[in-house]
Amino acid sequence: MPIPALPSLQQLENAEEFLARHIGIDAADEARMLPVIGSETRAELIDGIVPAAIRRAKPMRLPAPATEADALAELKAIAAKNKVFRSFIGQGYYGTHTPGVILRNVLENPAWYTAYTPYQAEISQGRMEALLNFQTMVCDLTGMAIANASMLDEATAAAEAMTLAKRSVKSKSNVFLVSGDCHPQTIEVIKTRAAPLGIEVKVSTVSETLPHLMVSGEFFGVLAQYPATTGHVHDLRPLAGHAHQCDAAFCVAADLLALTLLAPPGEWDADIVCGTTQRFGMPMCNGGPHAAYLACRDEFKRSLPGRLVGVSVDTHGQPAYRLALQTREQHIRREKATSNICTAQVLPAVVASMYAVYHGPDGLTRIAQRVAALTAILAQGLAQMGREPVNGTAFDSLTIRTGDDTPKIIERAQAAGVNLRQRLQQHLGISLDETTTRADIETLWALFVPAGTPMPRFDDLANAVPRLPEDLRRTSAFLTHPVFNTHKSETAMLRYIRSLSDKDLALDRSMIPLGSCTMKLNATSEMIPITWPEFANIHPFAPAEQLVGYAQLDAQLRAWLCEATGYAGISLQPNAGSQGEYAGLLAIRSFHEANGQGHRNICLIPSSAHGTNPASAQMVGLQVVVTACDAQGNVDMDDLRRACEKHSDKLAAVMITYPSTHGVFETRVKELCELVHEHGGRVYVDGANMNALVGVAAPGEFGGDVSHLNLHKTFCIPHGGGGPGVGPVCVVEDLVPYLPGHATAGVASNGVGAVSAAPLGNAAVLPISWMYCRMMGAKGLQAATEIAILSANYISARLKDHYPTLYASPNGHVAHECILDLRPLKDSSGVTAEDVAKRLIDYGFHAPTLSFPVPGTLMVEPTESEPLAELDRFIDAMIAIRGEIRRVEEGVWPKDDNPLKHAPHTAASLMAAEWPHPYSRELGAFPLAELKLAKYWPPIGRVDNVYGDRNLFCSCVPVGDYKETEEA
């Protein structure tokens, strides 16, 4: 018998090892799946699905795949090029200590970071409780009535505050006043947002102060910083009163840590309060991700943008959390939505809320008092040296007039590894934080001490009085709910975090087959680098020479993404897909204006589009015209042609999703692009479904002008329960000059300002996508696309006799997702798509996308990461559910009393003394025998959505409510 040949060293090194870790289907699985679909090979399948006219002419040019160990080592070398200085820049970004129990058990825990946005309330109670804690924390600290469940960053939250004010007040003015004492990046983002909406932004200056600007009364809103970016604590109460006399809204960008000591804006009649929670446990991360917040008066709540967690009851009368007032949002109201915000910053919001739970009101107050005390000591020492701070009041920040000494002090600071705030004429700024030490104060004094002047002695100044105005001191209590006063030991905190994560269903438990969401593997090796100090402890406005590693990461990732999409340029600044859409449409609008075509203001959008598309279009001042889809779910080309001809002179853009939101590759997409170009418009190809394109087709090659990507879909950044995300905007050559700039960071653009607070957006999660691309290589990325398509078609084929696929190509194939049509079942059995979604919970699954893009359907996207066993488990569950529906159709079970109508089944409901249903308790709990081995138990029954909106309650539930329901 011949001895088998030994593998070569190259084979043993196995550079492509990660492909098999990321892709759940192997060659043997393929051999089983392909005959079910009716194809002999994967190549044959792809050739029959992806139109030949759009296939890539050449493979992607990317580095060969690296092993996990090699990729981590390579990225570590890049990270080492960043210089981690002690940053006292402030400007909205501060050092913080992330408690280890939160770092390990939330930020680095897949039970938290792999979860999806909590649309399915019954399997999201844990993170919604954490988000309700977040909302309560914000309301308590700001003194406002209601707060949402996070915004993208402080600057975009301020821009949303501006538009919220515009929608909510009586004033008909188009002028928005902004204090020059606001953070400069906030002012820039506000100006970017205001311009296409016809809002005039007036910024106060030294000579033209905010009170002076307010004299005319011609404005609809005002924004002030509290404390100011210079550190001064202004008394804003008179200005708030004057704004109300003018029928305008008074908005405040407030520091939450400072509000533990300062009178909250809600107590002096502010209307809207926004800001960031970054310093509540999230590192600076070169600008993100961090959870911003937005709070307002109760009467503004129906115009409040973003997610809002509210309290309702389940079918058993128990308190239950849910997303409230969703009719405000883009997925329902489309171009009439309050905002295009979709993905926000849930994971950082959970970190911030846990930080508040862990420290409690006393701990937060102590941290704030220590910061204020150190600031007073620093200020008094500087005054002794003749460097009296300009701001007589302060919480954590000082502005020092340095005149001609400025360059010398900066040079000394750099030599000492210290960053000071430099963008103040003849002045330098210093901001302290939770991490500041006695040694830091002494180092700072040494930088400013004039020659021959003795250094102050720290101990002599230890009793310096904080520089807070007496009449603005906080006297009201906050965070009084027991949740903020119970979990003080690490043991208690650990168990609280675990108790919440146990209530939820995330990717660490099962497949999440959500269509249009691409819930793929977030590999551990991809996640590890995000908390490296070289990435996490970098200030976004540090000097460029300290950001060399980030610059290399940025350049490489942009190059790889351009290669994947076929575009010429890309910006990574947008910190969500919604912001990428906004930036892309802004580029189109700016291009038309620069070319004397500013009158082009019509945006054509197919009726099947995601709600962010029309919401984003209206944000840049475009008028949305909806075009039809045909019976097969494709863009109706005849209707589109009529619309193009009708609006030819005004056509700015057409927005499409490709493959379509209906889950098919439309064969006439190149023709569509050519038609739009003939009429002077540009083609926006929504990148939501890029997981079906990478390696096989590129939007920039088949006619797209602009696309945004969702790195939290296609390129492995986790969804985090609803954020963070990254939405890079990709453009063709002539639109590159109109990508977002960032004047605050010295990044120029052709009149297009910043769309995010930080120049690199959610910079700290970019290493995740870098690692994914580096380990997969061109071959792996294309294989991922092809397997995603294979898996979707396998599910569609196996379920076709039970649930017809609504849309497919002429040969019966789908793209990377399929829409299962459940509408006929409602007539035959009374069972709805929602009933099936809830029953899937009993089988241990997160439901597919419910009733989008077609009401009464389920859209399934398995991704390439799921193994065949999990696909089969899902298919078996769906077939078993169809069997249950058949028993209703046959009259075995009543239409209103069956396992689907009462799903999901909680352990408590199954153990009730009485069981009045015509099916067994066992069937309710264990519809398949295998579930007896491992079972996810939903913590609540089905949520009453109507009750929740009629009885809106958006802060922590009084403990008594739980006791009452238990006694009942």
UniProtKB/Swiss-Prot annotation:
<dbReference type="InterPro" id="IPR049316">
    <property type="entry name" value="GDC-P_C"/>
</dbReference>
<dbReference type="InterPro" id="IPR020581">
    <property type="entry name" value="GDC_P"/>
</dbReference>
<protein>
    <recommendedName>
        <fullName>Glycine dehydrogenase (decarboxylating)</fullName>
        <ecNumber>1.4.4.2</ecNumber>
    </recommendedName>
</protein>
<comment type="subunit">
    <text>The glycine cleavage system is composed of four proteins: P, T, L and H.</text>
</comment>
<dbReference type="Pfam" id="PF02347">
    <property type="entry name" value="GDC-P"/>
</dbReference>
<dbReference type="InterPro" id="IPR015424">
    <property type="entry name" value="PyrdxlP-dep_Trfase"/>
</dbReference>
<comment type="similarity">
    <text>Belongs to the GcvP family.</text>
</comment>
<dbReference type="GO" id="GO:0004375">
    <property type="term" value="F:glycine dehydrogenase (decarboxylating) activity"/>
</dbReference>
<dbReference type="GO" id="GO:0005829">
    <property type="term" value="C:cytosol"/>
</dbReference>
<dbReference type="InterPro" id="IPR015422">
    <property type="entry name" value="PyrdxlP-dep_Trfase_small"/>
</dbReference>
<keyword id="KW-0663">Pyridoxal phosphate</keyword>
<dbReference type="GO" id="GO:0019464">
    <property type="term" value="P:glycine decarboxylation via glycine cleavage system"/>
</dbReference>
<dbReference type="GO" id="GO:0030170">
    <property type="term" value="F:pyridoxal phosphate binding"/>
</dbReference>
<dbReference type="InterPro" id="IPR049315">
    <property type="entry name" value="GDC-P_N"/>
</dbReference>
<dbReference type="Pfam" id="PF21478">
    <property type="entry name" value="GcvP2_C"/>
</dbReference>
<dbReference type="InterPro" id="IPR015421">
    <property type="entry name" value="PyrdxlP-dep_Trfase_major"/>
</dbReference>
<feature type="modified residue" description="N6-(pyridoxal phosphate)lysine">
    <location>
        <position position="713"/>
    </location>
</feature>
<dbReference type="GO" id="GO:0005960">
    <property type="term" value="C:glycine cleavage complex"/>
</dbReference>
<keyword id="KW-0560">Oxidoreductase</keyword>
<comment type="function">
    <text>The glycine cleavage system catalyzes the degradation of glycine. The P protein binds the alpha-amino group of glycine through its pyridoxal phosphate cofactor; CO(2) is released and the remaining methylamine moiety is then transferred to the lipoamide cofactor of the H protein.</text>
</comment>
<dbReference type="InterPro" id="IPR003437">
    <property type="entry name" value="GcvP"/>
</dbReference>
<dbReference type="GO" id="GO:0016594">
    <property type="term" value="F:glycine binding"/>
</dbReference>
